[in-house]
Amino acid sequence: MQVEVAFSGSVMSVEALARFLKDLEQLVPAPVETPKVVMGDDGVIYVKAGFATEDKAWRAGEQMAEVSAEIVEDTDVLVVLAPFAV
Protein backbone atom coordinates (compact mmCIF):
# COMPACT_ATOMS: atom_id res chain seq x y z
CA MET A 1 0.00 0.00 0.00
CA GLN A 2 1.31 3.44 -0.89
CA VAL A 3 1.06 6.08 1.85
CA GLU A 4 1.80 9.82 1.89
CA VAL A 5 3.65 10.79 5.06
CA ALA A 6 4.33 14.36 6.14
CA PHE A 7 5.46 14.70 9.74
CA SER A 8 8.53 14.64 11.90
CA GLY A 9 8.67 12.69 15.10
CA SER A 10 10.63 10.40 17.35
CA VAL A 11 11.81 6.94 16.42
CA MET A 12 9.07 5.60 18.68
CA SER A 13 6.47 7.57 16.69
CA VAL A 14 7.77 6.20 13.40
CA GLU A 15 7.77 2.65 14.77
CA ALA A 16 4.21 3.08 16.07
CA LEU A 17 3.11 4.41 12.68
CA ALA A 18 4.79 1.51 10.85
CA ARG A 19 3.00 -0.96 13.12
CA PHE A 20 -0.33 0.78 12.53
CA LEU A 21 0.11 0.85 8.74
CA LYS A 22 1.07 -2.82 8.67
CA ASP A 23 -2.13 -3.71 10.53
CA LEU A 24 -4.17 -1.35 8.35
CA GLU A 25 -2.94 -3.17 5.26
CA GLN A 26 -3.68 -6.60 6.75
CA LEU A 27 -6.96 -6.04 8.61
CA VAL A 28 -9.17 -3.80 6.49
CA PRO A 29 -10.12 -3.56 2.82
CA ALA A 30 -7.78 -1.36 0.83
CA PRO A 31 -8.73 2.33 0.83
CA VAL A 32 -9.80 3.71 -2.54
CA GLU A 33 -7.45 6.69 -2.13
CA THR A 34 -3.84 6.77 -0.98
CA PRO A 35 -3.84 7.20 2.82
CA LYS A 36 -2.21 10.40 4.08
CA VAL A 37 -0.42 10.67 7.40
CA VAL A 38 -0.32 13.94 9.32
CA MET A 39 0.72 14.93 12.82
CA GLY A 40 -2.00 16.88 14.55
CA ASP A 41 -1.36 19.91 16.74
CA ASP A 42 -2.44 17.66 19.60
CA GLY A 43 0.47 15.24 18.99
CA VAL A 44 -1.80 12.55 17.57
CA ILE A 45 -0.75 10.86 14.32
CA TYR A 46 -3.74 10.78 11.97
CA VAL A 47 -3.99 8.40 9.03
CA LYS A 48 -6.62 9.81 6.68
CA ALA A 49 -8.06 7.12 4.41
CA GLY A 50 -10.96 7.17 1.98
CA PHE A 51 -13.17 4.11 1.58
CA ALA A 52 -15.79 3.26 -1.03
CA THR A 53 -18.78 3.48 1.33
CA GLU A 54 -19.73 4.88 4.74
CA ASP A 55 -20.14 1.31 5.97
CA LYS A 56 -16.62 0.31 4.91
CA ALA A 57 -15.20 3.49 6.47
CA TRP A 58 -17.08 2.83 9.73
CA ARG A 59 -15.93 -0.80 9.90
CA ALA A 60 -12.33 0.15 9.18
CA GLY A 61 -12.48 2.77 11.93
CA GLU A 62 -13.80 0.24 14.43
CA GLN A 63 -11.17 -2.37 13.59
CA MET A 64 -8.30 0.09 13.68
CA ALA A 65 -9.47 1.60 16.99
CA GLU A 66 -8.50 -1.68 18.63
CA VAL A 67 -5.07 -1.51 17.01
CA SER A 68 -4.69 2.11 18.15
CA ALA A 69 -5.47 1.10 21.73
CA GLU A 70 -2.82 -1.62 21.69
CA ILE A 71 -0.21 0.70 20.18
CA VAL A 72 -0.82 3.54 22.64
CA GLU A 73 -0.69 1.07 25.53
CA ASP A 74 2.66 -0.28 24.33
CA THR A 75 4.30 2.96 23.15
CA ASP A 76 2.40 5.99 24.53
CA VAL A 77 2.06 7.11 20.89
CA LEU A 78 -1.48 7.61 19.61
CA VAL A 79 -2.02 6.72 15.95
CA VAL A 80 -5.62 6.85 14.74
CA LEU A 81 -7.45 6.18 11.53
CA ALA A 82 -9.52 9.07 10.20
CA PRO A 83 -11.72 7.17 7.73
CA PHE A 84 -14.14 8.80 5.32
CA ALA A 85 -16.35 7.74 2.43
CA VAL A 86 -15.34 8.87 -1.04
Predicted regions and their residues:
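Acidic-basic catalytic patches of nuclease active cores, encompassing PD-(D/E)XK
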Residues: A16-K22
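An amphipathic, aromatic/His-enriched active-site/gating alpha helix that lines ligand/cofactor pockets
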Residues: W58-D74
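Short secondary-structure junctions
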Residues: K22-E33, I71-D76
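N-terminal presequence-like segments and adjacent domain-start helices
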Residues: M1-E15
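Short edge beta-strands and adjacent turn/loop segments
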Residues: Q26-Y46
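A short interface-forming secondary-structure element
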Residues: I45-E62
